[in-house]
């Protein structure tokens, strides 16, 4: 989240829209202690939301998350028009059936599912404690899994085709968020505004996850 806060700040002031994103990310991530101020801000900010009440984060997320989806759909349309994007779609949607017989495929998939849904963490326990007794747990769980999967697919159809269009390694990890995504935003109208909203939405989503970790402690 500290890295995302850095990206948000540079988007807000326009710096991220005018730099070589790969050089920007490398300079920041490889500089000793550069992330500490942002990390402190994130930790203190999260603690304040817990002390002062987390309802504001919940209300904000109800606005930011739909905006997040809308902007990603706009970016998906832009990426679809880039040369080489089709190779990205083939990479995503061409099944490799032989991989299903590899036990590690299932282990990685289950690990990703557990992490993404906070099944093995404190998230379900903490937020479940606040759940109304009138809620249908099975129905809510189904909705959570469904929308989590939709979010992953939407992100994939933006990032992966863009990797092929820009010649970026699809297995690059965090740099996809801080190199590939900003590069796309530099190429679209109102890219700076979209960048500010996207990274702000990611911060709110991240803080909502940190809240349950801190509260469990």
PLM regions: where:
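Membrane-embedded translocation segments of transport machinery
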Residues: 58, 62-211
């Amino acid at each position: 989240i500290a890295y995302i806060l850095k990206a948000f700040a540079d988007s807000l002031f326009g710096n991220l829209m005018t730099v070589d994103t790969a050089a920007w990310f490398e300079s920041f991530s490889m500089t000793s202690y550069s992330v500490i101020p942002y990390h402190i801000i994130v930790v203190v900010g999260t603690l304040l939301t817990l002390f002062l009440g987390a309802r504001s984060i919940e209300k904000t997320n109800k606005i930011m998350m739909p905006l997040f989806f809308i902007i990603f759909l706009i970016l998906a349309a832009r990426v679809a028009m880039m040369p080489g994007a089709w190779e990205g779609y083939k990479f995503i949607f061409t099944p490799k059936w032989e991989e299903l017989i590899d036990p590690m495929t299932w282990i990685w998939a289950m690990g990703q599912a557990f992490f993404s849904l906070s099944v093995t963490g404190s998230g379900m326990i903490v937020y479940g404690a606040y759940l109304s007794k009138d809620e249908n747990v099975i129905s809510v769980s189904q909705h959570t899994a469904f929308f989590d999967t939709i979010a992953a697919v939407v992100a994939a159809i933006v990032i992966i085709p863009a990797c092929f269009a820009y010649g970026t390694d699809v297995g690059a990890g965090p740099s996809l968020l801080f190199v590939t995504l900003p590069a796309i935003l530099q190429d679209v109208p109102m890219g700076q505004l979209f960048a500010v909203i996207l990274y702000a939405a990611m911060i709110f989503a991240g803080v909502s996850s940190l809240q349950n970790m801190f509260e469990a402690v």
